Amino acid sequence: SNRAPDSRWYDAEPWVISDMRGPGVDDIIKKVHAAAQSYPYPDEYRVWPGPNSNTFTAHVAREVPELKLDLPPIAIGKDYLNNGAVFAKSPSGTGVQFSVLGLFGLLAGVEEGVELNLLGLTFGIDPLDPAVKLPIMGRLGPRTTIFRPAIESPAPGPAL
């Protein structure tokens, strides 16, 4: 694709799923760069079931658990595990995931809640950040904050 990574997708605005600032961020940035370099599918892209841009984001999240990313249920491809694996830690690093080529799977994590993946579509519940997760609709529940300090800090620094 020749599109910019943060460009609109069918006129939808991209949104921030993690914003970390303050002391400790430089180390996280280095880990993100290393994770991006270790992505096993740099020259492959399949919209469904993956690998795609959401597979890449999930890979970086798994490699950098400090991000604690809870990828949106509409992120088709997030459940496509690297190199044919069927078990992995969840993208947030706070749970576990079982997935068969991103087509069928289960995930349970502190950040994500419990998710069922059928044909790349996510159905789930998040009891700790109350929401129901549905394909196309996304998260149904109170809005969550997208700002999470890397380490408690009195003054924000540059964004990641």
Residue ranges with predicted function:
Residues 47-57:
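Amphipathic, coiled-coil-like alpha-helical scaffolding segments used for oligomerization/assembly
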Residues 21, 53, 71-74:
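Intrinsic-disorder/low-complexity, polar/charged segments
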